[in-house]
Amino acid sequence: MYPDCDEILKMAPDYDIIPVCREIYADVITPITLLRKLAAVSKRYYLLESVEGGEKWGRYSFLGFDPVMRVKCSCGKVTIEKDGEETEKVTDKPLEVLREILKDYKAPRLAGLPPFAGGFVGYFAYAMIGYAEPKLKIKKGTFNDYDMMLFDKVIAYDHLKQKISIIVNMKTDKVMENYGKATAQIQDLANLIRSQQTADIPVSKSKIDFTCNVSKEEYCKLVEKTKEYIVDGDIFQAVISRQFSSRMREV
């Protein structure tokens, strides 16, 4: 377990939270196995995978569950879900809401920890560019502009060392009490990982039919027209795309 309590006591005055970590061997456990274990104890969980160079798996897989907070934005209305309550605010700078929240979660970067030890996990939709460039008048989609969840517990699967890092971020207001809670949570997670407890992850078996907003012929014409603009010196670069969409029937 690291850092130990003495080290945390020294760091506590400078930080709001401190990550506490324990490593265990992965053995025959895989990231998908871990995800199924988290699905057995929580309705909100995630798995982040990474690929390097488009061909090789990244070193780490990251998993988490039971977020302490959810923050979502739609058309400038930000909704914050925390401790079973919702608060709303209207803003033209929704990213600032996330930045303000993170100010209360200042944490040290500890040597030996994986590159991600806790924080927001979610997505930013294409429509977010509309807040930075309002003249573009981006059409609102069916998704939230962003949907983020704040996780204070992280399981990092190290494919290189075949080890699993169990990380719990503890608050520094009551060091001794919170350190005890963090170590207990880590032990509970270690027990869950080693247990046989799993759950099936819902998978849609429906046939998916996609529709496109631009035909292939129209798209080819756009490409040729763009080439002409570049040759004429009107532009030097353009990104032309086709939007494919499908309605979800089941999950």
Model-inferred region functions:
Residues 1-251:
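Extended alpha-helical targeting/anchoring segments
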